[in-house]
Amino acid sequence: MTAGTVVITGGILATVILLCIIAVLCYCRLQYYCCKKDESEEDEEEPDFAVHSHLPPLHSNRNLVLTNGPALYPAATTSFSQKSPQARALCRSCSHYEPPTFFLQEPEDEDFEGVRNGGGRVAYKSISQEDVELPSASFGGLQALNPNRLSAMREAFSRSRSVSTDV
């Protein structure tokens, strides 16, 4: 390939990449405005802001176990089910505003009642050489490491040189 062919091919490739990036950005912007328009139509129909909460209500009861389904939150599900069929047909990707269909059960341990971020107190202990006891029966088949052999291995690997050649 000549230099001119490489330059032309690179220019075409760069143009295609830029056009792909522009197309993705335009698509994302279209989806953003489409979903934004759906939200503004819902706001005009129902000005009650408590109904438009995208998050389920928080409960302080630790023993409350939430099971599958947003049916536990009727106030939150009414705004999601009132999207017009036209809006759903145009913006199918706007369904990410629906509440999650699963909830996690909180741990029932009463020990961590006052501790936040899910951690209890952790005790650390330093280990000395006397604390570590190795069972002699399990290492019976292994030989002890000879210090002379170890130094000989170090010398053998330190003498190796890397060889470079002209390209």
Swiss-Prot record:
Pfam families: FAM163
Keyword vocabulary terms for this entry: Membrane, Phosphoprotein, Transmembrane, Transmembrane helix
Transmembrane segments: 6-26
Keyword Ligase among record annotations: no
Family matches, as InterPro entries: FAM163 (IPR029379), FAM163B (IPR040280)
PTM-bearing positions, type Phosphoserine: 40
Main location: membrane
Signal sequence bounds: none
Any one annotated GO CC term: membrane
Record localization: Membrane
Cysteines engaged in disulfide bonds, as pairs: none
Membrane topology field: Single-pass membrane protein
Family, as annotated: Belongs to the FAM163 family.
UniProt xrefs under PANTHER family: PROTEIN FAM163B, PROTEIN FAM163B MEMBER
Name the UniProt record assigns to this protein: Protein FAM163B
This protein's encoding gene: Fam163b
